[in-house]
Amino acid sequence: MAKGPVATSSDDELPFETEEPVADERSFFGGRPQKPAARNLRPALTASLAAPEHYHGHRERLRDRFRELGDTALADYEILELLLFRLIPRRDTKPIAKALIERFGSLAGVFGAPAALLTEVKGVGENVALDLKLIATVAHRTLKSEIRSKQVLSSWSSVIQYCHAAMAHETREQFRILFLDKRNVLIADEVQGRGTVDHTPVYPREVVKRALELSATAIILVHNHPSGDPTPSRADIDMTKVIIEAAKALDITVHDHIIIGKDGHVSLKGLKLI
């Protein structure tokens, strides 16, 4: 039986019809791949820019509540969220604010946390952490200004507020001294030592020496307990008595030793331990 001519195809034609594009096999063997046709992305981009993110309306409502009703109308995480609006302008900051509060327990805990720990929270980068620490520093300086050039003993609540803001959320023990003049006005506030989570080395001779250098006639000792419990230890009491005796020999008065915890403080003088 005679066979008819067999259809052949050129490089540009296929012997059958197809609706699917067929790749040029030459591109798999060293030839330059063919570039796909350029797509016009402008309409999609324009639509994306025009459509507001879902959290923008929420931001405006939160701002309005703060503007009209003040901070008492907002939860702690919402106050933090308002602040994060400016620090992280193109993200939903509500989950970040909630995560920060959950991690550190409170607003005070967030602002008292070291920058390195802040960056462990998802969404908080180094710049945001530094901004939060800057805000904390402004708050500390503001509180410190409340006790500067005033008689410290008559502004005791301000002293406690300042010490709590400065030390309550430190992760290591810190020993601080407030040096006072003969009118009990603050001369200097200095950190004398930093230690471990449960101990700070304190040298009574160095405490008294620094008081003489500043011409201080009285001091207030302050240190924190990172555990959160401000209850004084036997070592705290004994160390305080040694400093009192060393200072007394040079007519320097130790007014008190305050221990700062996360949620409160203890005065050794108030407990009649000194």
Swiss-Prot record:
UniProt KW Protease keyword: yes
Cross-referenced Pfam families: RadC (PF04002)
Superkingdom, taxonomy of origin: Bacteria
Gene Ontology terms, MF aspect: metal ion binding; metallopeptidase activity
Bias-annotated ranges (Acidic residues): 10-22
TM region positions: none
Endpoints of the signal sequence: none
An individual GO BP term: proteolysis
NCBIfam families, sorted: PRK00024.1 (NF000642), radc (TIGR00608)
Stated family: Belongs to the UPF0758 family.
Protein name per Swiss-Prot or TrEMBL: UPF0758 protein RHE_CH01848
